[in-house]
Amino acid sequence: RTSAYQMSIMQHALPYFANQTVMDVGAGNGILSLFALQAGAKLVFAVEASTMVEHLHHLVRAAHAQDGDSVPNMWTRDRLAVVHARVEDVTPGMLREAAPIPVEPRVDTIVSECLGVLLVHERMCETLLEARDRFLKPDGAVFPRVGILCFSLLNDTRMWQEVRARGEWWNTTDFYGIDLTP
C-alpha cells in the first residue's frame, strides 16, 4: 500500500504537489508527508492526533539541529509543519503557528491514508471530509479521491471455526495456569 501511495504522489507531482501547500490528514508516522515533500511540496502540514507525531517532531528538530550537507533529511527543513491534534480540533491559527513560513491556512492538496477495513473501519473518511470542507482551496485536490468496495459471497467453514475459536479464548480456565474467564 505504501508503494502505491508513493507512486501515485510521484506520478501526480507536477499538478498537485510541486510548489503546493499540502495537508496530510492522520499523518501517523508521516510517510505521506515525506512523499509529498519529495514530490516538491512547498509546505506540508502533518496533522496527527496520536503520540506517533513525536517521531515527526524528532525529524523536524534533527533537520534544524545543525547546518551542512550531512544533516539527515535536510530537505524537510522549513517545509514540514507538524500539528499534534485531531483535524476536527485544528484551527487556522494552529496552522499559521505551526508553519515555518508565512502561509494562509488553506491547502492546495490533501493526502490521507484513510483506508481502514472496508474504508470505514477507522472512521477516517469523515475526518478526511472535515479537512476537505474546512481547509482545502476551492480548486484543490484530495488523494485518494475515490474508494471502491468490492464484495463477494464466501462460505468457509474452517475459517469461521478459527475466528470463533479466537473469541472463545477468553473462556479458557487454564491458560498456563491463568483463569481467563470473567
Regions found by a protein language model. Give the residues of each.
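Class I SAM-binding transferase module
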Residues: 1-2, 6-25, 32-182
